[in-house]
């Protein structure tokens, strides 16, 4: 799992370097625990108090897409919950998931 995340982060950085001169921002976007069908089947074993709906990551994408200065983020890794705090959006249930750090996992 960690190797695939590292590869995605590296690909993001490399693509950003190639595409920034063309005005294209490349951003790696990490969701938190998403309430997918699979996650909900295991809900009795999980703490879903800080989970996100599948729509939440879409709101993060929409916020980035509407940001006229998004190019400043190119090559970065962003966490959806942190973007929610910055851009002021919430999940469909009105909650704002707390951004987790590696220490929290």
Where are these regions (language model features)?
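Catalytic tyrosine of NAD(P)H-dependent dehydrogenase/reductases that use a Tyr as the general acid/base
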Residues: 1
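Short beta-loop-alpha junction of Rossmann-like oxidoreductase domains
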Residues: 24, 30-43
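C-terminal helical subdomain
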Residues: 28, 47-105
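Active-site-adjacent segment of SDR/Rossmann-fold oxidoreductases
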Residues: 14-24, 68-71
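Hydrophobic alpha-helix immediately C-terminal to the catalytic Tyr-X-X-X-Lys motif of short-chain
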Residues: 7, 11-15, 19, 29
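Conserved cofactor-binding/catalytic machinery of classical short-chain dehydrogenase/reductase
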Residues: 7-10, 35, 53-56, 60
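Active-site helix of classical SDR
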Residues: 4
């Amino acid at each position: 799992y960690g190797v695939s995340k590292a590869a995605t982060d590296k690909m993001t950085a490399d693509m950003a370097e190639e595409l920034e001169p063309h005005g294209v921002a490349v951003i790696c976007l990490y969701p938190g625990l998403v309430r997918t069908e699979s996650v909900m089947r295991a809900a009795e074993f999980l703490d879903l108090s800080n989970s996100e709906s599948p729509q939440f990551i879409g709101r993060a994408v929409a916020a980035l897409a509407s940001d006229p200065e998004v190019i400043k983020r190119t090559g970065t890794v962003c966490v959806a919950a942190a973007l929610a705090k910055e851009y002021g959006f919430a999940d469909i249930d009105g909650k704002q998931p707390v951004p987790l750090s590696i220490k929290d996992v």
